[in-house]
Amino acid sequence: MRSVIKNINDMANLYPNREAYIGINEKVTYKELNEKISKMLIFLSKIENNIDQICTICQKESNAVAILLATSLLNIDNSIIPYDAHQYTKIEDVEFTNDVIVISEEDFDKNTTILTDVSNHFINSPIEKNNIKDIVEKESLKDIQLFFEKSCSPAKLILYTSGTTGKSKGVIVSYNQFNFINVPITEQNEGINIITKGSSVRPFLGTILSTLKEGKTILQIDVDNCFDMTNLCERADIESLTTNIYGIKKFISIAKKNKHLYNRIPLVTITGGVMHQFLREKSVEVFPNAKLLDLYGQTELGLISVIDSTEWCENEYCVGTPSFFVDVTIKDLHSHMELKEREIGHITVKSNHKFKGYSNHTAIALDEVYTGDLGYLKDSKLYLFGRISDCLKYGDSWLLKRDIECKLSEGFSEKFQVLVRDGRFYIILERHSSRIEKIIEDKFSSFKQLIQIKIVQEINETN
């Protein structure tokens, strides 16, 4: 076992009654978690190379622990546990956001039904119950793709829905998640490793791994159909194909190729959705020693974040899903040097194909789909800044303009404005407030000398 399990073992000895979130609805003490792991390891000692068998055994105890063990067995130190709202188990009528349902022949014969969205509308699309057999035989739902995986025994159908993320519901009637890893894509087995059709921005802006070394890139792939995938595989050296379930399959497939490469790799996430924020925070509790880096930013095309489709407006222009690939480089665009800790540089994501936006918007991807100034903070989190002028450095620490704005908004109800000028933050008020001074003292004491309060007659854009 590697360091993730060792960390939990250490925590069990130090804080046996401390509770750890291993899923949104799954909370145990470190002592209980350690006991679960110890129990499972007895079964895993002889089968550690069979990921599917590992997870099948582990899921009987705990979905999240199953993932923890699967990643730990493969020597991935910076694992992150996905929330268990939908994955890996025989759960009926649950929300799912990975838009994949695996159906066995037995389920097919029993006329199993599923709940899925049936329209091409990404906003407020209807949810209906449909019989799987009818879908296969009549092809009555054109918005649903079915692929037959011929290499499995017994054979299984893999159902990919159009995927209104955060809204679709389905029945996961059979566990088969890790069978699709690192299988070559051919015309004969086109159902294997096919990525969900029309899913949300999550595959593009969701979990991304990066070595942060020598500008190495890792492909995050999301395609619409087998034709695109065939072209992609002919044109690029694909390290792995993954669904949009927080990169778990990417963790495993890449780590299997080079176990030593990912010993020191931070997990980079571009987050914004509530669930991702929850996941990030709770993963720190579960893995206190894990190094999690978070990217935040904004682009001309829309927010760099994961936003449920129900939150979008008709006139909102979102990036959508890349049809081919995006590569992520963590290095300065000007010097072309990799970023060191506490350095500021540029990050870019590039694509060679179209990006499909929601509400029928389409656009050719820019050479630089988004760019932003990048920097490390003292808490080991990586931030993507909209502009370099929006943050200031003092000593080894960085302070963002929006950090001040957020804290002031929480504790101050009157109108204010935060500006960055000449190496200082200026808080603009229309009248003096002792409350502002207290917030600065409590929240930004180490930056006090960089923060000044200015009183004006009226707050406006010309301040």
Language model features with spans:
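Conserved AMP-binding/adenylate-forming core of the ANL superfamily
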Residues: 17-48, 55, 59-61, 87-90, ...
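Conserved AMP-binding/adenylate-forming
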Residues: 43-85, 195-198, 398, 453
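AMP-binding/adenylate-forming catalytic core of the ANL superfamily
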Residues: 56, 351, 367, 372-463
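Conserved pre-ATP/AMP-binding loop-to-beta segment of ANL
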Residues: 16-19, 120, 125-130, 134-160, ...
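Conserved AMP-binding/adenylation subdomain of ANL enzymes
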Residues: 179-193, 200-240
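Gly/Ser/Thr-rich phosphate-binding loop
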Residues: 239-241, 254-315
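Conserved AMP-binding A3 loop
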Residues: 29-30, 147-149, 156-183
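Conserved ATP/PPi-binding loop(s) of AMP-dependent carboxylate-activating enzymes
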Residues: 321-325, 335-367, 381, 387, ...
